[in-house]
A protein has these predicted regions:
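Catalytic alpha/beta active-site cores
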Residues: 1-260
């Protein structure tokens, strides 16, 4: 489950991250199980300031805080405030969209080779306080992830190593899944697919849906009883790790799925 979380951490919700942490100051209401609308407003405001900072508009008087909608015209992102229209100051930061050009459901922007996705969903609960019906801002976060075979997962004996190798194999084959229960409900977690959009020139656009996965093998001074040599001695654990994890990677090399 945690390996899946790490692999899927390439794209994360800015709104969830803000609402659930102390980036925004906590109040008594926000600490309860109930939704705090005041905190929700603060999350939206923070999100708008984030967009203002990294994706400023041509018409600075309008500003991200005042926009009411989006549309795509001739490959350009048009940002609306009622009857007023403006564009990004740096138009190259608009990459593509999802949905209809005159009523997009998502806008994809890029800054310093990292992407963000503005989700527009008037039916979402989180969009009810938003004049542009933005329900979330998804940010490209963990571009790479290191999967450990030693200390951080406390892999000591043969049984532990088999679990590590099985998880790594599932990640490389793309079929790793985890089922768990929470609050009386059963959930299944699996690897995220690529993210699909329409580029500014009207063609299909795909972005990696998962982190680029790296593997950390054990140092060569350690040995492990999982495999015994002819003389009965334990195999050097680093060699065992290198051989088995590399063999698992062959599945990914054939279909080129890692970081997707």
């Amino acid at each position: 489950r945690y390996a899946l979380n790490a692999a899927n951490a390439r794209w994360m919700s800015l709104y969830d991250s803000l609402y659930g942490t102390d980036v925004i100051e906590q109040s008594e209401d926000s600490a309860s199980q109930r939704y705090d609308p005041l905190r929700g407003e603060m999350v939206i405001k923070y999100g708008r300031n984030f967009l203002e900072r990294y994706f400023p508009l041509e018409n600075i008087i309008m500003g991200w805080a005042n926009i009411t909608g989006f549309k795509i015209e001739n490959g350009s992102l048009i940002i609306c405030k009622d009857s007023q229209e403006t564009k990004l100051k740096d138009k190259s930061k608009f990459i593509g969209h999802r949905g209809e050009a005159n009523n997009p459901s998502a806008i994809i922007l890029k800054n310093n080779n990292l992407h963000i996705e503005i989700i527009i969903d008037p039916n979402a609960f989180s969009a009810q306080q938003d004049p542009a019906k933005i329900s979330d801002i998804i940010v490209e976060a963990a571009v790479s992830t290191i999967c450990d075979n030693e200390d951080s997962v406390a892999a000591v004996d043969a049984d532990d190593k088999v679990i590590c190798y099985r998880n790594w194999l599932g990640l490389m084959k793309g079929d790793l899944k985890s089922t768990f229960e929470k609050n009386g409900k059963t959930y299944e977690r699996k690897l995220n697919p690529d993210r699909s959009y329409i580029s500014k020139d009207g063609k299909g656009l795909k972005l990696h849906g998962r982190s680029l996965l790296l593997i950390r093998n054990v140092g060569h001074l350690m040995t492990n009883s999982a495999i015994l040599l002819k003389d009965g001695s334990e195999i050097p654990e680093g060699i065992m790790d290198a051989f088995i994890t590399s063999a698992a990677c062959l599945h990914d090399i054939k279909k080129k799925g890692n970081s997707r």
